[in-house]
Amino acid sequence: MSDASHELKTPLAGIRLLTDSILQTDNMDPETTKEFVTDIGREAERLSRITENLLRLTRLDGGVVPSAYPVAVGPVLQRVERMLGMVAAEKGVVISGAVSEDAVALATDDDVHQILYNLMENAIKYSAPENGFVRVEASVQDGQVVITVTDNGIGIPDEDLPHIFDRFYRVDKMRSREVGGTGLGLSIVKDTIEGRGGAISAGHGPDGVGTTFTVRLPLAQREEEA
């Protein structure tokens, strides 16, 4: 938990320093003030996500699993795209998606949101430094909802693939420190998916470039959707 503790302290320290700078600087120009406030917002969002992941981890470990119900993937994806849009734009990453209307999973809205947010945020972090993209697709295959999240980033070495869903595991620790993270996101995604009777796998992207995560969730039946 030391990694998680450190990650909690980092945004808190940033918020405090930025706030102190604003309060202690007389006649700070509006543009600088706006930049500082924007940075405070980013750090607050980062802190919120870390806290949310830790709380979800506690619930999963405690066996607290809310009842599942039909969740359309499309609207959740649109919401996550809006939330991550600014982060992606700042990195020059283009997010695109193609979702079948039939992609209705038997889970909870929070489940699907957590899965998409963690996978897409991760893909944006590790996307290519130039002309980066993140592609999300959702369809129905073999009686399951299949979601794929693909990026054109640095990819995951073959020796790391069996371990990426392990708790607190981070591929290339030097690179991980640059982009941040606790090493909990993928573990939480896996536990969430398996808690709904689904599965997740990871592999190389098209032509061996980047990474593709494939999620399989139970399909909500028509009577469940009614």
Regions found by a protein language model. Name each.
Residues 62-71, 75-76, 106, 128:
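Short flexible loop/turn segments at helix-to-beta-strand junctions
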Residues 42-47:
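Short alpha-helical segment of the dimerization/phosphotransfer core of two-component systems
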Residues 123-124:
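Short helix-loop "hinge" at the ATP-lid/N-box region of the Bergerat-fold HATPase_c
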Residues 156-170:
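Short conserved segment of the HATPase_c
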Residues 197-199:
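Conserved glycine-rich
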Residues 23-30:
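Short acidic helix/loop segment immediately C-terminal to the autophosphorylated histidine
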Residues 69-70, 89, 94-104:
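Conserved catalytic submotifs in the C-terminal HATPase_c
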